[in-house]
A protein has these predicted regions:
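Short linear loop/turn motifs
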Residues: 222-232, 340-345
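Short beta-strand-loop/turn "lid" adjacent to the catalytic site in phosphate-handling enzymes
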Residues: 65-103, 128-137, 180-201, 226, ...
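Short glycine-rich loop/turn motifs
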Residues: 15, 83, 222, 297, ...
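Active-site core segments that coordinate phosphate-bearing ligands/cofactors
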Residues: 6-9, 109, 115-128, 135-189, ...
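Residue-level signal for inorganic ion chemistry
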Residues: 25, 48, 77, 105, ...
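Short secondary-structure junction motifs
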Residues: 15, 71-74, 167, 220, ...
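N-terminal glycine/serine-rich phosphate-binding loop of ATP-dependent small-molecule kinases
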Residues: 1-98, 126, 240-248, 436-440, ...
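A short, local hydrophobic-aromatic micro-motif
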Residues: 28-29, 75, 222-226, 250, ...
Length: 510
């Protein structure tokens, strides 16, 4: 196996990466390309699907070239993707009918409030495990069918979008489906991505007729739902296409479930938190779909071929790494690495709290109209205090989730496995250990999202035989133990709720 590998396409919110892994789970080739963030109106966020696909072709080609690897040496390709981001495309031409609506997009908040006012939220939550929110795909698909620009569909009229969809001439999907379609020609998604649409019954493991009717999304346009690691494969790449080889596409997971898989959280009670644009804290709950009483989501964790679905509890935090990007945008820092130095330069925030609710608040608050807030400033407040408060906000939001997770599951997390770009920041990792009063374990391979999708694909084709091999690959880079007292952590966390309260229900005019 020394000369064969597994590739992973990691299509994220800000860019697309292709990583090639060897049997030991080590990265042997890597390429990354950013794509444009499109903001047509306040609260609206879009991506160009064509740009995403072109970037995917580019990073796959560049990574293989840089690693001196021929595409024929890839035993399989796995896919992981920004979840909930939704697009519709023409089945014959492959042309998107509109930009993709990104998971952060809030344009359907009014529609979600209609559902809540009509008393439908509990029924939706019971079937899907999801708190109705503009975050998920259902209202995005509905909006696209109502509003997609008809001029992008040659010869069609605005009124016939749903007719064409019912006839299977239009396809809808999350980004994994878009990539699988372009790679293989097949319309497929996996169970984890399906579970994020708000159209899928996670108990029956099927598209739900009542939800499809509620959002008027024809079933004919939906992808086939398959296991996350699929021994029957989703399809093969075209040997006459850009890769020049026929490679099985055999695994897919939404990015947060991929990180759960990559962190080898295969057992009930295992938990991880990924710090990316947002942060997503998942705990494996085994074969039981645990219902949350504390604002968490019940979701599909993963499924391997021929095996039962593994469920998870999830706390979705919409803005963490994006708050660091905001500090750059407003010139408080010049790069993300600078945050640790600035935060260490002051002993505290001097009472400043920052709530980074730029796109509303996710778990456990679920307020789509919350907005970013800084409170507690005085004339003596400096940028160092605001930078430190921003890092602390990441730790506080994570504690919100950890407390809800323990309340719902009845299990206390003794070690939290962390990954994502922000965990390279030792100050943040130590701060997180202190605020949670929990050990933080950072793995050697921190690109666990890509690694998880590679593992799923590799298991499907027999590159790895068992999940025990994957457990053996997982190695700790560093552990962070709490250095702060319980009392001090509680004191700092104590005013966080007050700050959050001031951010709620702000964007009343949107």
């Amino acid at each position: 196996m020394a000369d064969t590998y597994v590739g992973a396409i990691d299509q994220g919110t800000t860019g697309t990466r292709f990583m090639v892994f060897d049997h030991g789970g080590h990265v042997v080739a890597n390429s990354y390309e950013r794509h444009e963030q499109i903001y047509p109106k306040p609260g609206w966020v879009e991506h160009d699907p064509t740009e995403i696909w072109e970037n995917t072709e580019q990073v796959v080609t560049d990574a293989l070239d840089s690693g001196g690897i021929d595409a024929s040496q890839l035993e399989a390709i796995g896919i992981t993707n920004q979840r909930e981001t939704t697009l519709i495309w023409d089945a014959e031409s492959g042309r998107p009918v509109h930009n993709a609506l990104v998971w952060q997009d809030r344009r359907t908040t009014d529609r979600v409030e209609e559902l809540e006012e009509a008393g439908k939220a509990d029924a939706i939550r019971a079937k899907t495990g999801l708190q109705p929110d503009a975050y998920f795909a259902a209202t995005k698909a509905e909006w696209l069918l109502d509003n997609a620009e008809p001029l992008k569909l040659a010869g069609s009229r605005a009124s016939d979008l749903r007719d064409r969809a019912r006839d299977g001439e239009l396809l809808v999907g999350t980004v994994d489906s878009w990539l699988i379609y372009n790679l293989t020609g097949n319309h497929v998604t996996d169970v984890t991505n399906a579970s994020r649409t708000m159209l899928y019954d996670i108990h029956e493991m099927a598209w739900d007729d009542e939800l499809l009717e509620e959002f008027d999304v024809p079933e004919a346009m939906l992808p086939e739902v398959r296991p996350s690691s699929d021994e029957e494969f989703y399809g093969h790449t075209d040997p006459d296409g850009f890769l020049g080889a026929e490679v099985p596409v055999a695994g897919a997971l939404g990015d947060q479930q991929a990180a759960l898989f990559g962190q080898t959280c295969f057992d009930e009670g295992d938990a991880k938190n990924t710090y990316g644009t947002g942060s997503f804290y998942l705990m494996n709950t085994g074969e039981e779909a645990v219902e949350s009483d504390h604002g968490l989501l019940t979701t599909v964790g993963f499924q391997m071929s021929g095996e039962p679905v593994q469920y998870a509890l999830e706390g979705s935090i919409f803005v963490t790494g994006a708050a660091i990007e905001w500090l750059e945008d407003v010139d408080l820092i010049t790069n993300a690495a600078q945050t640790a130095e600035l935060a260490r330069s002051v002993d505290s925030t001097d009472g400043v709290y920052m709530v980074p609710a730029f796109t509303g608040l996710g778990a456990p608050h679920w307020d789509g109209r919350a907005r970013g807030t800084i409170v507690g400033m005085t004339r003596g407040t400096r940028k160092e205090h605001i930078v430190r408060a921003t890092l602390e906000s990441i730790a506080y939001q994570t504690r919100d989730i950890a407390e809800a997770m323990e309340a719902d599951s009845g299990a206390e997390t003794t070690t939290l496995r962390v990954d994502g770009g922000a965990v390279k920041n030792d100050f943040l990792c130590q701060l997180q250990a202190d605020i949670l009063q929990t050990e933080i374990a950072r793995p050697e391979v921190d690109e666990t999202t890509a690694l998880g999708s590679a593992y799923a694909a590799g298991l499907a084709v027999g590159y790895w035989d068992t999940i025990d091999e994957l457990r053996d690959n997982w190695q700790i880079d560093r552990e962070f133990d709490p250095e702060m007292s319980d009392a001090e952590a509680d004191r700092m966390y104590g005013r966080w709720d007050d700050a959050v309260e001031r951010s709620l229900d702000w964007a009343t005019e949107e």
